Amino acid sequence: MLPAAPGKGLGSPDPAPCGPAPPGNTKDIIMIYEEDAEEWALYLTEVFLHVVKREAILLYRLENFSFRHLELLNLTSYKCKLLILSNSLLRDLTPKKCQFLEKILHSPKSVVTLLCGVKSSDQLYELLNISQSRWEISTEQEPEDYISVIQSIIFKDSEDYFEVNIPTDLRAKHSGEISERKEIEELSEASRNTIPLAVVLPTEIPCENPGEIFIILRDEVIGDTVEVEFTSSNKRIRTRPALWNKKVWCMKALEFPAGSVHVNVYCDGIVKATTKIKYYPTAKAKECLFRMADSGESLCQNSIEELDGVLTSIFKHEIPYYEFQSLQTEICSQNKYTHFKELPTLLHCAAKFGLKNLAIHLLQCSGATWASKMKNMEGSDPAHIAERHGHKELKKIFEDFSIQEIDINNEQENDYEEDIASFSTYIPSTQNPAFHHESRKTYGQSADGAEANEMEGEGKQNGSGMETKHSPLEVGSESSEDQYDDLYVFIPGADPENNSQEPLMSSRPPLPPPRPVANAFQLERPHFTLPGTMVEGQMERSQNWGHPGVRQETGDEPKGEKEKKEEEKEQEEEEDPYTFAEIDDSEYDMILANLSIKKKTGSRSFIINRPPAPTPRPTSIPPKEETTPYIAQVFQQKTARRQSDDDKFCGLPKKQDRARIESPAFSTLRGCLTDGQEELILLQEKVKNGKMSMDEALEKFKHWQMGKSGLEMIQQEKLRQLRDCIIGKRPEEENVYNKLTIVHHPGGKETAHNENKFYNVHFSNKLPARPQVEKEFGFCCKKDH
């Protein structure tokens, strides 16, 4: 019996008929029990907390059952139903309780029956019209068994389960099988108790040249130091054996006189096991050898066959997934223990002693290929060891296994070569470097004239170098390594010049994601800097109209470029947003001009560190319309302004005039365009360098605009005060205001801007309003005309 949970004695308060229902989908375990099994329910709750949370467990006392609980608590939705079957539950069963249990326990694969004080669950399932549960545990098992059963039910998605429906007439037979299985388990437990704690092999040792002995322990040794004490009638010796594995220890046998010797195994100074061995004189050993030779070595052969069968059975049932590993080299030094050098693996041991069945089983384990080829300190593999010890049949098994492995490897190599050949037919780039040279030139047509020519010159030289480098591929070499190297070199996103000039080194970091070559070239050479400086890209763009790749936009391309033009059109259907950074006059690109001009074409850091691309831009730039020269516009505006000055004071300006003043033509001429652009560029540079956030830059630019507009309003106010002062001092001149208007508006740009500010400024109370001035001095604009 398992001990009851600590602190859960009989004096504990009675819990509720059922615990709180787990919230949401955390419904893993429901335990159904009667009052006499309450302690077991509480104990199992503590055990199952290692697997599930406390909220996922529901304790349901059956004496307070109700059919409404099936819907309110959703009892049938739990993954695992654990029924604690006790005598009280069987005694108090009623038809309603049976019906209630049938609805909860309808799925046998999710039901676990815990036998608590009863021998079998047959009596319960005879009263219920459902199949017997698949899982049945008892109170005599360990907590690990309970956890493993619960895990197999809750996490059943990872395994295949099937439902077994046992007919009524076969339940007796099934219960008999369960009882037989229990008897077998009891017998195995009893036989385990009869196994001695330690066994020394061989049990009989010759007095002269005793050789090695092996000490086999039933249980693993947890302590740090293990000592073996040999005691005879007149001699006692204690020594430390060598570790073979967790349960087997090896040492050289000590020389004792003929007779019995007691062996005590100490672990950290405490006796763990006791056994006895026997020493016999040399004459008796010779008699035994002659007797074995006369009987045809039947005794030795029978013992070897029995050992072979026992070891094979142990490996098949106890260690089904054995894997060859050099564990002994990690535990002990090979220089100190020579048997590791002679028999490095169990396969060598089976070859030496002729354990045929064990060798066949080991050859099916993981790592058997290298274990069969591994040589000991004498340079012998398992096949040679079996031949040296006269095991011809075992030697043939090893040789057949080696031949089979060679055939499998050859088939894999042939399949690999066929895959490479079929792969190379679909990708001609692996065999024709000149094809990549043509595609490189196609990608490079969108670059500017000067650098495109330089790249073509370098590409030809590097292309010839690539042809000489990969010439074995053209001759017909089938080397898979060269082919994969060639594929790696010609990734479209990689830089072909860098790949051809610098060999691929294993110490280099992995390459970035592939990108089109043309896009990389265009992004790494922006043509913009700050205003007021000469940019090389602008000069190159002016020369670029003579290049065939640019001339195709205007329709003047030669006939030899038609095929390339068609290919470019297909490529332009899926253009990268970065492609047009070189032909658009955008402030976004002007920010990174100084950084980008210093970088070379082969550099990758500029592309990686560049911020996200803006909105995709149009594929072509419409030609700019012919505009009137600036000086002509100024004189035209002067003329138009003189004609409209006569109607200044007749009324407020019309909406059409306001619209004309705020038209795009005047907005481009409105002041401080260059200053605003410079201020915006400086702020954007600070944002890109991380010195300022985007919100701070926007706020600063707004303050700058407000400061600019404030200065202009102050100038307008001063100008208006000057006009009023002049008009107030010289009231006799009626046309003085018109003259001042002409004098203070020399250009259309300033006129439009100042008038706009003039009509929008609110006059203060200190100065007289304009209608009062006209009324006071008695002049009107219509008198002159």
Curated annotation (Swiss-Prot):
<keyword id="KW-0772">Systemic lupus erythematosus</keyword>
<dbReference type="GO" id="GO:0051898">
    <property type="term" value="P:negative regulation of phosphatidylinositol 3-kinase/protein kinase B signal transduction"/>
</dbReference>
<keyword id="KW-0075">B-cell activation</keyword>
<feature type="compositionally biased region" description="Acidic residues">
    <location>
        <begin position="569"/>
        <end position="578"/>
    </location>
</feature>
<dbReference type="GO" id="GO:0045947">
    <property type="term" value="P:negative regulation of translational initiation"/>
</dbReference>
<feature type="region of interest" description="Disordered">
    <location>
        <begin position="493"/>
        <end position="514"/>
    </location>
</feature>
<dbReference type="GO" id="GO:0042113">
    <property type="term" value="P:B cell activation"/>
</dbReference>
<dbReference type="GO" id="GO:0043491">
    <property type="term" value="P:phosphatidylinositol 3-kinase/protein kinase B signal transduction"/>
</dbReference>
<dbReference type="GO" id="GO:0002020">
    <property type="term" value="F:protease binding"/>
</dbReference>
<feature type="compositionally biased region" description="Pro residues">
    <location>
        <begin position="611"/>
        <end position="621"/>
    </location>
</feature>
<dbReference type="GO" id="GO:0050853">
    <property type="term" value="P:B cell receptor signaling pathway"/>
</dbReference>
<keyword id="KW-0040">ANK repeat</keyword>
<dbReference type="Pfam" id="PF18567">
    <property type="entry name" value="TIR_3"/>
</dbReference>
<feature type="region of interest" description="Disordered">
    <location>
        <begin position="433"/>
        <end position="480"/>
    </location>
</feature>
<dbReference type="GO" id="GO:0032715">
    <property type="term" value="P:negative regulation of interleukin-6 production"/>
</dbReference>
<dbReference type="InterPro" id="IPR041340">
    <property type="entry name" value="PIK3AP1_TIR"/>
</dbReference>
<dbReference type="GO" id="GO:1990782">
    <property type="term" value="F:protein tyrosine kinase binding"/>
</dbReference>
<dbReference type="GO" id="GO:0005102">
    <property type="term" value="F:signaling receptor binding"/>
</dbReference>
<protein>
    <recommendedName>
        <fullName>B-cell scaffold protein with ankyrin repeats</fullName>
    </recommendedName>
</protein>
<dbReference type="Pfam" id="PF14545">
    <property type="entry name" value="DBB"/>
</dbReference>
<comment type="function">
    <text>Involved in B-cell receptor (BCR)-induced Ca(2+) mobilization from intracellular stores. Promotes Lyn-mediated phosphorylation of IP3 receptors 1 and 2.</text>
</comment>
<comment type="subunit">
    <text>Interacts with LYN, ITPR1 and ITPR2.</text>
</comment>
<dbReference type="GO" id="GO:0000165">
    <property type="term" value="P:MAPK cascade"/>
</dbReference>
<feature type="region of interest" description="Disordered">
    <location>
        <begin position="606"/>
        <end position="625"/>
    </location>
</feature>
<feature type="repeat" description="ANK 2">
    <location>
        <begin position="378"/>
        <end position="408"/>
    </location>
</feature>
<feature type="compositionally biased region" description="Basic and acidic residues">
    <location>
        <begin position="553"/>
        <end position="568"/>
    </location>
</feature>
<feature type="repeat" description="ANK 1">
    <location>
        <begin position="342"/>
        <end position="371"/>
    </location>
</feature>
<dbReference type="GO" id="GO:0050869">
    <property type="term" value="P:negative regulation of B cell activation"/>
</dbReference>
<dbReference type="InterPro" id="IPR000157">
    <property type="entry name" value="TIR_dom"/>
</dbReference>
<dbReference type="GO" id="GO:0043274">
    <property type="term" value="F:phospholipase binding"/>
</dbReference>
<feature type="region of interest" description="Interaction with ITPR2">
    <location>
        <begin position="1"/>
        <end position="154"/>
    </location>
</feature>
<keyword id="KW-0597">Phosphoprotein</keyword>
<dbReference type="GO" id="GO:0048471">
    <property type="term" value="C:perinuclear region of cytoplasm"/>
</dbReference>
<dbReference type="GO" id="GO:0035591">
    <property type="term" value="F:signaling adaptor activity"/>
</dbReference>
<dbReference type="InterPro" id="IPR035897">
    <property type="entry name" value="Toll_tir_struct_dom_sf"/>
</dbReference>
<dbReference type="InterPro" id="IPR052446">
    <property type="entry name" value="B-cell_PI3K-Signaling_Adptrs"/>
</dbReference>
<dbReference type="GO" id="GO:0043410">
    <property type="term" value="P:positive regulation of MAPK cascade"/>
</dbReference>
<dbReference type="InterPro" id="IPR036770">
    <property type="entry name" value="Ankyrin_rpt-contain_sf"/>
</dbReference>
<feature type="region of interest" description="Disordered">
    <location>
        <begin position="538"/>
        <end position="578"/>
    </location>
</feature>
<feature type="domain" description="TIR">
    <location>
        <begin position="25"/>
        <end position="153"/>
    </location>
</feature>
<dbReference type="GO" id="GO:0050731">
    <property type="term" value="P:positive regulation of peptidyl-tyrosine phosphorylation"/>
</dbReference>
<feature type="domain" description="DBB">
    <location>
        <begin position="200"/>
        <end position="327"/>
    </location>
</feature>
